[in-house]
Design a protein with these regions (language model features):
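Polar low-complexity intrinsically disordered regions
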Residues: 1-2, 147
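An anion-binding loop in the catalytic cleft
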Residues: 71-160
Length: 160
């Protein structure tokens, strides 16, 4: 039976700051090699290896899971941004407007969780992140610095 059979397998170490779109691209390239290898094995009459362990299925991501909790650690927030950078995207609200954040990095700074500075630093439970790219509601993706030029955060203003 071919169910739960493995024809080809390649291990891949995911680099630290990889976003989901970057991972999809890398895996699509690696997949070509795996598929080619599997076709050769099938053509040569080889039998597949049985899968060990249980099958794991990822649950569907709910929209509310993509909302940033600024009381989380900077690392947790960055992981969420990288994981959902492309789809469905992580978001937060400020001044009642939804902002999707597609790229950020760890930064030094001491701000309250969710507090945003004029330079795009945002406070977290244990530090800060620097906004790099984002998408305001109804607009195209843009560098955070361009958004900040028009938005002009007030002292102590916070993402919700």
């Amino acid at each position: 039976m071919l169910f739960r059979s493995i024809w080809s397998q390649i291990e891949y170490q995911i680099p630290y700051a990889t976003t989901s779109p970057q991972l999809f691209e890398a895996l699509s390239e690696i997949g070509v090699s795996a598929i080619s290898n599997a076709i050769d094995l099938i053509a040569n009459g080889s039998t597949p290896t049985a899968q060990s362990g249980e099958v794991s299925i990822a649950a569907k991501v709910k929209k509310e899971e993509c909302r940033i909790d600024w009381n989380a650690s900077a690392e947790e927030i960055l992981r969420k941004i990288r994981a959902f950078a492309f789809n469905p995207g992580v978001f937060s609200f400020i001044r009642g407007e939804q902002i999707k954040i597609s790229e950020a990095q760890l930064a030094e700074g001491i701000l309250a969780p969710g507090e945003i500075s004029a330079t795009g630093l945002v406070g977290t439970k244990d530090g800060a992140i620097q906004l790099i790219n984002l998408t305001p509601a109804g607009k195209k993706a843009m560098p955070a610095k361009d958004w900040l030029n028009g938005f002009k955060p007030q002292q102590g203003e916070r993402f919700e």
